[in-house]
Amino acid sequence: MGSMSIWHWLVVGVLVLLLFGKGRFSDMMGDVAKGIKSFKKGMSEEDEPTQPAEPRPTPRLQQQPPIEPNADPKLQPMQDDRPQH
């Protein structure tokens, strides 16, 4: 008995027909065909040259208000505590 003889394929075919049914299997194949057509259409649309969009001017940033010194006397600038080499 060889592997994948004609009888094996017939049994597999009957099981597929029983599980999916005649109409359901053809519907699935139709959906696959629609997907392939849609994919091909999308690929052909990408090949068409597109005109680059006009560059928009960059928005100017508004000047920020100057930093006011902090009036809190407890605050001091950070000290560098790294060891000197």
Curated annotation (Swiss-Prot):
Q: InterPro entries, alphabetically?
A: TatA/B/E (IPR003369), TatA/E (IPR006312)
UniProt xrefs under NCBIfam families? PRK00720.1 (NF001940), tatAE (TIGR01411)
Region span, Disordered: 39-85
Q: Name one GO biological process term.
A: protein transport by the Tat complex
Transmembrane feature ranges: 1-21
PANTHER family tied to this protein: SEC-INDEPENDENT PROTEIN TRANSLOCASE PROTEIN TATA
Subunit structure, briefly?
Answer: The Tat system comprises two distinct complexes: a TatABC complex, containing multiple copies of TatA, TatB and TatC subunits, and a separate TatA complex, containing only TatA subunits. Substrates initially bind to the TatABC complex, which probably triggers association of the separate TatA complex to form the active translocon.
Gene Ontology terms, MF aspect: protein transmembrane transporter activity
Annotated keywords: Cell inner membrane, Cell membrane, Membrane, Protein transport, Translocation, Transmembrane, Transmembrane helix, Transport
How this chain sits in the membrane, per its record, is: Single-pass membrane protein
Query: Which species expresses this protein natively?
Result: Rhizorhabdus wittichii (strain DSM 6014 / CCUG 31198 / JCM 15750 / NBRC 105917 / EY 4224 / RW1) (Sphingomonas wittichii)
CC annotations in GO: TAT protein transport complex
Q: What does this protein do?
A: Part of the twin-arginine translocation (Tat) system that transports large folded proteins containing a characteristic twin-arginine motif in their signal peptide across membranes. TatA could form the protein-conducting channel of the Tat system.
Which gene name belongs to this protein? tatA
Q: Where does the protein end up?
A: Cell inner membrane
What superkingdom does the record give? Bacteria
Name this protein carries in UniProt: Sec-independent protein translocase protein TatA
